[in-house]
Amino acid sequence: MAELPDGALMQRAAAGLAAAVADLLGGAYGRRVVLLVGPGDNGGDALWAGARLARRGARVDALLLAEQAHEAGLAALRAAGGRATRDLADLHPDLHPGPDVVVDGIIGIGGRPGLRPDAVAALDHFAGVPVVAVDVPSGVDVDTGSLHGPHVTADLTVTFGTHKAAHLVDPASRASGALHLVDLGLDLPPATIEALQPHDVRALLPRPGSDAHKYTRGVVGVRAGSGTYPGAALLAVAGANSGLAGMVRYVGPEAIADRVRATHPEVVGAGRVQAWVVGPGGGDDAARMLAEARDDGVPVVVDADALRHVDGPVPGCVLTPHAGELAAMLDVERTEVEACPLDSVRDAARRWDCVVLLKGHHTLVADPDGRVRVTTTGVPWLATAGAGDVLAGLVGALLAAGLEPYDAASVGSWVHGAAATEASGGGPLTASRVAVEVPRVVRETLAAPGPGALG
């Protein structure tokens, strides 16, 4: 990228920010805008964007929350007819009953998490007014997505160049609201966290060649279910029997095997496999299930009850805990995992020398080298009994089909979330219905136009 004139990046950012604010408001003319301005470049972005909005007919007031403000941006705002003050009580009288939008330019990506009391007071004063955050909501931990104190909760975050971890990782992702990315034309460093897009998934999904047969497409085995939880076996098999592998084998209690075969007549019994799925509904048999699967020397998806029996490094495996299960494995409180899931999943992947898929609002997949992918597909209705069993089976099928554990876990999670969106249609869903929608999601993803970024 050619060297840009001084201030060009800020002008690009401000232009994108102003356009996003105007779009949110349905136009700028006659609208009332308050800028909350800190001392850094985020404050400068807000001031320059405010100047652009003022020139388009908005009434713009800036509340300066630091002794210093971006001088050129402040001068531009005033030249365009905007006002600036350091006193909340001195804001424009026309703001009664309140502004149409508040622009959060308090702290940028280099700031420390948390907010000062004057910023908290300003946010409280404008409670209920839509908030647009500049780059990231002020006060969140940009690098980990954790929250360490007061922070902005935005309706819209306008970010520049690339998304940040805080936009994608809970709990900070919930504070970001809708995301709008402004391309600054930058040469970006390698990403520390990835969110797969449809073209990425399409490039990774296994496709049978013209000479394929059921064995070359992979055989996945499922060891799941017990007298207490027979349905877990049916759901794990449903996920595995999505068509992504050539064959599914079920090994378990004969009474459950009869139900599996009645529901899924394609499923066969014991034999050689390329991957195992172990643990869903396994109960007291989970330890034996895991040991026998590990003895085969093939990749294993370790879920649910089997997670309690992981007592050392398990290279080649994929662990699929939710926050409570991971907390028990790490011997910490669940709240600690939920407060910083990114650090927790990376710690787990290093500790057990394998891929770890941490299920949640935004599911995270980490490998022992520190790579992380986040899944942004799915709907809140996916928080339902049995959904994790389907996911375990789906990941197992992808492993059997030949994907590396990191790719199998992240692609499986993406497809699972997309299938849930289809199954939901805006309303409740069941885990069984998610499994039914997987082939359609795969078919539509493979057929969609666009480049294969990872292929």
Predicted segments — roles?
Residues 76, 84-85, 148, 180, ...:
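Polar low-complexity intrinsically disordered regions enriched in Ser/Thr and small residues
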Residues 100-101, 106-193:
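Internal gly/pro-rich beta-alpha loop/helix module
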Residues 18-106, 114-134, 299:
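Nucleotide and nucleotide-moiety/phosphate-recognizing core
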Residues 81-89, 138-142, 201-206, 301-307:
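Short gly/ser/thr-rich secondary-structure transition/capping motifs
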Residues 1-65, 154-156, 163-304, 308-318, ...:
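Small-residue (G/A/S/T)-rich helix-start motifs and N-terminal tracts that mark the onset
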